[in-house]
């Protein structure tokens, strides 16, 4: 996404409020109207619900309620604006541990067979090691909130990097089929705008 739009945060109160609430902010503008109702969006998100990692899964990514545990709604609507939450679970497998086990396995087999293992054979061994370690691996969880303002044509992602925001937008795109957005460029640097808020 290379096309950008210019926004003056100081004169756009809905976005200003979201900026103050989100710890990080990646802001995008819809290039076409977002016409999905909250109910329709809810049904689409249900097709990509978050489920925990199984014993052989490296990661899982899906939607959870933005209001936390004890609630089931995947879309929280207020005054025509929508709040979503994506949850990700990842298995933690240190590459150094995998490499050490692989090196030992390769050394043993090469000694037994009296030949060097081919690249494909090493890749197969690595896959076997991963499958052995995955059920015992620690997991890491993260949640990312999205705020949609269809009326004004904006979507904000509470992400510290464009890469993380793009991953979440890709999940939303997968859920609803299409998500035409472009990143927004600011007229004023964030530090100047925030200083103006405090004055």
Named regions from a protein language model:
Residues 16-40:
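N-terminal alpha-helical "arm" segments
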Residues 183-199:
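Short, conserved secondary-structure transition motifs
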Residues 115-186:
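Internal, hydrophobic cores of structured domains that mediate oligomerization or house catalytic pockets
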Residues 1-18:
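N-terminal amphipathic/basic-hydrophobic helices that include classical n-h-c signal peptides
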Residues 26-29, 82-85, 153-159:
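Short cationic amphipathic helices and targeting signals
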Residues 35, 91-93, 163-165:
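Primarily extracytoplasmic ectodomains and periplasmic/lumenal surface modules that are beta-strand-rich
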Residues 20-21, 77, 147-150:
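Short, flexible turn/loop "capping" segments at secondary-structure junctions
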Residues 39-145:
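Surface-exposed, low-hydrophobicity interaction/linker segments
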């Amino acid at each position: 996404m290379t096309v950008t739009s210019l926004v003056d945060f100081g004169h756009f109160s809905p976005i200003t409020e979201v900026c103050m609430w989100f710890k990080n902010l990646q802001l995008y503008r819809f290039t076409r109207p977002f016409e999905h109702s909250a109910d329709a969006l809810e049904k689409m998100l249900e097709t990509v619900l978050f489920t925990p990692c199984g014993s052989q899964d490296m990661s899982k990514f899906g939607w959870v309620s933005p209001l936390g545990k004890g609630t089931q709604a995947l879309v929280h609507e207020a005054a025509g604006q929508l709040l979503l939450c994506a949850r990700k679970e990842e298995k933690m497998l240190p590459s150094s541990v995998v490499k050490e086990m692989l090196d030992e396995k390769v050394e043993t087999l090469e000694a037994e067979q009296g030949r060097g293992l081919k690249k494909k054979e090493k890749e197969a061994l690595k896959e076997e090691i991963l499958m052995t370690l995955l059920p015992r691996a620690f997991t890491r969880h993260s949640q990312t909130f999205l705020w949609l303002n269809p009326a004004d044509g904006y979507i904000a992602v509470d992400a510290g990097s464009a890469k993380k925001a793009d991953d979440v937008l890709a999940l939303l795109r997968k859920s609803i089929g299409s998500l035409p957005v472009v990143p927004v460029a600011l007229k004023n640097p964030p530090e100047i705008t925030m200083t103006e808020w405090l004055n």
